[in-house]
């Protein structure tokens, strides 16, 4: 577990440098603790692994004010555990379910038990995301997702994929994306 914690800390350190997030920004976390253990997703969930991962994420949350959203497994349609305040702030519809390790996944179940005022919502548009073990978090990211590359690519046996998001660039060839080089010309 010590080696996994060190891997996790290294991943989060690099991710935070490349995706500077602050108060109110939402980070979605999808995690198969089974995959961390080297087992097939959904077969060997571990509350101990979930606790280790959660501790580092919670420290990041307390330091920066980010909001965490923990994706449940497919048995709960990949719904998300968030704090009630996050649901209110983002206008998210709360659904009635309590995640457990066998229906929701160990990570979401653990987060539900550790949050101050947890609720479950069906969807969110997160500013960034962490996918541990191919849990498919893309449905919960804002467009446009941008991959974040880090030097440590695994926690235990689980592949880790990271993403941040950026606003869409709209407008075509004459569009301006910075006031430093305005295209003020009206000629065609």
From Swiss-Prot:
List cystine links.
Answer: none
SUPFAM superfamilies in the cross-refs: TTHA0583/YokD-like
List the Gene3D superfamilies.
Hypothetical protein TT1679
Q: Which NCBIfam families match?
A: TIGR01440 family protein
Which protein family is it in? Belongs to the UPF0340 family.
User: What name does UniProt use for this protein?
Assistant: UPF0340 protein GK3370
What organism is the protein native to? Geobacillus kaustophilus (strain HTA426)
